[in-house]
Each structure stands twice: as structure tokens, then as C-alpha cells.
């Protein structure tokens, strides 16, 4: 078992990313659709059905994700943050691979991911990331349309990932995509 840490955690991040990507593409294929909205992925109920069909779930946390995540999350600069989303439209799960994941319907889905669940280090940008699932089935950082440009990813990283930014934590995942799955920060 590979412990997620600087460099080695890349295996876990990539595994979950690949599983999400494959599930999105398979969902469109299974529904004979050109994009996720056409396939029916439009709200919390359809996201819940998508997760249950394409992923092995060991725990459902429903609209209160706190039971799916650890305690004491921090950003790289040491500021505190809680990635467990709560709300009527949020759905949180622990997957069989140990990852904690929350889906928030928002122009398809915003995704909060802790690649190793409640286990440490619980640091945004190390084992915890914010991603987006776009209508075209791509998974990327936050931008107008996926795939995000390298410049957009770098801007998000420098603006939000490593600094206290009032609860915004985009950019960490995009930086890893830009840097070929390596944490260079």
C-alpha cells in the first residue's frame, strides 16, 4: 500500500482522477449522449445515481459530509479549512479505494476529494483537492470551459491554493495537471 505523501500520493490522485474520467465517459456512452447534461446528469438525484452505478461505495454521508472526512484540515500556508460540504444538493461518499468525495451540482459538478479519506496529512493541495466535472466529461480545475489553459490553472494556483483565500481553494489540482502529476510546490 502506497502512503499518500509528497510524490507518492500521485498514485492515489491519478487513480481517482482516472476512475472519475472513465465513469463520466461511460455514463455518456451508456446514455447515448454527446455530453453529461444530455445524458441526464443534471441534479443531486442524478449525481447520486451516477456515483452508485459507477463506483464502489463503502459509506454514504448524504447531505452532511462531515462523517466522510477527517478533522483539522489546513491549507499549505497553515490556514484552516473544512472540505466537507453540507447542503441539500451535496452528496458525500467514501469509496472502496479509501477516498472521500463530495459532489455539489454546479454546472454539472464541483468535486471535493480527499484521496486517502480521513487519514492525514489532510492538507489542501497535498491529499485534498477541489475539481470540476464539466459537461464534456472532462475533469479539471475551475475555469470557464474544460480543458483549462495552463495559464488559467497557474493563476488559480497562485491566487487560491497555497494562500489563505477566504475559503477558496481552487488551483491545487490544476497545478498538478500542469506539472505532469507531480507536486512541484
Question: Where are the regions a protein language model picked out?
Answer:
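Single conserved hydrophobic/aromatic residue that forms the stacking wall/gate
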Residues: 2-8, 12, 20
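Alpha-helix exit/C-cap motif
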Residues: 18-40, 56
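Intrinsically disordered, low-complexity regions enriched in Pro/Ser/Thr/Gly and acidic residues
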Residues: 43-185
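Generic structural signal for short, flexible, solvent-exposed coil/loop and linker residues
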Residues: 1-2, 82
Amino acid at each position: 500500500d502506497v502512503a499518500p505523501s509528497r510524490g507518492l500520493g500521485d498514485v492515489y490522485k491519478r487513480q481517482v482522477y482516472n476512475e472519475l474520467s472513465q465513469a463520466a465517459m461511460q455514463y455518456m456512452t451508456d446514455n447515448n449522449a454527446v455530453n453529461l447534461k444530455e445524458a441526464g446528469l443534471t441534479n443531486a438525484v442524478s449525481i447520486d445515481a451516477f456515483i452508485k452505478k459507477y463506483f464502489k461505495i463503502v459509506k454514504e454521508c448524504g447531505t452532511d459530509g462531515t462523517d466522510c472526512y477527517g478533522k483539522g484540515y489546513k491549507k499549505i500556508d497553515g490556514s484552516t479549512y473544512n472540505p466537507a460540504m453540507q447542503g441539500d444538493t451535496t452528496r458525500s461518499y467514501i469509496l472502496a479505494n479509501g477516498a472521500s468525495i463530495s459532489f455539489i451540482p454546479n454546472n454539472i459538478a464541483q468535486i471535493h476529494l480527499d484521496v486517502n479519506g480521513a487519514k492525514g496529512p489532510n492538507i489542501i493541495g497535498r491529499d485534498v483537492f477541489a475539481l470540476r466535472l464539466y459537461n464534456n466529461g472532462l475533469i479539471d480545475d475551475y475555469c470557464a470551459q474544460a480543458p483549462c489553459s495552463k495559464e488559467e490553472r497557474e493563476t488559480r494556483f497562485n491566487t487560491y491554493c497555497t494562500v489563505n483565500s477566504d475559503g477558496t481553494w481552487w488551483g491545487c489540482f490544476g497545478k498538478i495537471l500542469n506539472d505532469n502529476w507531480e507536486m512541484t510546490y
